[in-house]
Amino acid sequence: MHANWKTWAHVTKLDPDKRLPRGAVEEIATSGTDALMLSGTLNVTRENLQELLDLVSAYGLPLVVEPASPDCAIFDGGIDHLFVPSVLNTNDVRWIVGKHYAWLRQASGIDWEMVVPEAYIVLNPNSAVGRVTGADCSLSTGDVAAFAQVADRYFRFPIVYIEYSGTYGDPAIVQAASEAVENATLYYGGGIRSAEQAAEMGRYADTIVVGNAVYEEGIDVLRATVRAVQ
C-alpha cells in the first residue's frame, strides 16, 4: 500500500546535491512534516540520490522521488511514489513530454501505481529550473489560472504545482490557480521561510513544499511552517 499523497499538507524537499549537518535528517523526520521529497535540478545523479535515500529511509516517513532525469527515476529503496513533472509553460517539448518518452523507451518494469504526474507552472525566471527548462515566467494571474485549468480539466493531471523555486511567490496567483482547479491537488513551492508565509500559501494550496529553508534557516523554522498548516 503506497502512502496517500492527497492528504499531505506539508512536504519537505531535500536536494541530493546539498549537504545536511550531522543529525539534521532525524530532526527533519521528526518535525511533523507529512513526507519527504527528494528532488533537485542541478547535479543530481543516481549515486547522490541513492546516498540521500539511504539517509532518510530509516525514519518511516513517506518518501517521494521527483526525478530530474530518466536516470533518476527509481522505484526501489523504500520510496512510496515517483512524482514526474511536466513543465507546461515552456516551449521546449523535452520538458513537457520528451524526457518522459525517453524514459519509457529505456525503462522496464515500471510500477505505474507509484507514478504520479505533476503539471508544473514555473514562475521564477532566475531559478535553476526556470533557466534549464526555458519556462516563460512572465505569466499573468489569468495565464496561470488557464494553465492550471488545462492541466486539471483537459489533461487530468493529479497534481498542479505552482513553482517559485527559491523565491516567495504571489499569493494572488496561487489563489487564482486554486480557484481554477477542481480535481487536482494544488502544490505550492518557493521561498517559504516563516510560519506566516506557510499559512498564507496554505490558505490556497492543498500542499506546501518547504525546501531551501531547511538548509538556510534551520529546523526551528521548518517546525514552524509545519505547525502553520497542520
From Swiss-Prot:
Pfam families linked: PcrB (PF01884)
Keyword Metal-binding: yes
Any GO CC annotation of this UniProt entry: cytoplasm
Residues that hold Mg(2+) according to the record: D15, T41
GO molecular function, one term: phosphoglycerol geranylgeranyltransferase activity
Domain of life (superkingdom): Archaea
CDD domains: PcrB_like (cd02812)
Pathway it works in: Membrane lipid metabolism; glycerophospholipid metabolism
Any one Gene Ontology BP term: glycerophospholipid biosynthetic process
InterPro entries in UniProt: GGGP/HepGP_synthase_I (IPR039074), GGGP/HepGP_synthase_sf (IPR038597), GGGP_HepGP_synthase (IPR008205), GGGP_synthase_archaea (IPR026438)
Annotated EC: 2.5.1.41
Record field: catalytic activity: sn-glycerol 1-phosphate + (2E,6E,10E)-geranylgeranyl diphosphate = sn-3-O-(geranylgeranyl)glycerol 1-phosphate + diphosphate
Subcellular location: Cytoplasm
Keywords, alphabetical: Cytoplasm, Lipid biosynthesis, Lipid metabolism, Magnesium, Metal-binding, Phospholipid biosynthesis, Phospholipid metabolism, Transferase
Annotated positions binding sn-glycerol 1-phosphate: K13, Y161, I162, E163, Y164, S165, G166, G191, G211, N212
Record family assignment: Belongs to the GGGP/HepGP synthase family. Group I subfamily.
NCBIfam families: GGGP-family, GGGPS_Afulg, PRK04169.1-3
General function of this protein: Prenyltransferase that catalyzes the transfer of the geranylgeranyl moiety of geranylgeranyl diphosphate (GGPP) to the C3 hydroxyl of sn-glycerol-1-phosphate (G1P). This reaction is the first ether-bond-formation step in the biosynthesis of archaeal membrane lipids.
UniProt protein name: Geranylgeranylglyceryl phosphate synthase
Organism whose genome encodes this protein: Methanoculleus marisnigri (strain ATCC 35101 / DSM 1498 / JR1)
